[in-house]
Amino acid sequence: MKKRKESFWGLHFDFHARPDDKHIGRDLTEDDVREICRILKPDFIQIDCKGHSGWTSYPSKLGNAVPDMEKDTLSLWRKVTMEEDVALYMHYSGVYERKYCAEHPEERALMWNGKHHAESIRLNGAYVDELLIPQLKELAGDYRVNGVWIDGDCWMGV
């Protein structure tokens, strides 16, 4: 399996799960993923695991998984990509975090004008220890992903 620095050709599936999405995972099969790996021969595949909405598209143990999930697609992607020797990376929305901001308004980033940003989280609060680090450990430990791309921090950081 190629390391990221050895990779050139990759695929990014930019699905940001929301709580109103229905039947997540219902139609994805191992054969679908295997066909992608065998026909396109990517060095890596990157899929979404937590989008800007703050909901995960896999059954996270940390309480922010979308409610209508029919299949653990992350396990499916990991199983097949391991068998096909393709690295698997995650898309993870970092400071752009609508769900956590809504549930913990005191943790929102403070802007230049003294007001809190509606959807951007501060990194010197509880978020890093309560969600970010535990979720990254969950992805590395339970799913054995090859890496994570943290999205939003350069253009959503306040």
Give the ranges of each region predicted by the language model:
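Alpha-helical packing segments of well-folded alpha/beta enzyme cores
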Residues: 32-36, 40, 73, 77, ...
